[in-house]
Amino acid sequence: MSSCIQEIIQKLIAEYAPTKVILFGSHARGNPRPDSDIDLLIVKETSERFIDRWVMVRRILSDPQRMVGLETIVLTPQELSSRLAGGDQFLAEIVQNGKVLYAA
């Protein structure tokens, strides 16, 4: 795992306290290109609205010096379970093939 990803995960754990972080996409598959984004599914038990969670994570991880894009999906455990039960193939792919980088 790259030092950039490790740094992002450590900051996320320290400042947001997620229950799980899953890396997906080209970085998880081990074939990122120089212009590849870092894609993260972040799971946290919270009552905050979806957009508020996303904004908070973006603020925490904002770094104008980072030379790589960052894409995040922030869900509660209940939202994740519900979407998987509803047949969300995108999330199923992430859960099945992503790399769990952190689990509380």
List the predicted regions and their residue ranges.
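Short beta-strand->loop micro-motif that forms the acidic, two-metal-ion catalytic signature
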Residues: 39-43
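Catalytic core of pol beta-like nucleotidyltransferases
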Residues: 1-20, 29-34, 44-104
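Glycine-rich beta-strand-to-loop/alpha-helix junction loops that act as flexible
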Residues: 24-26
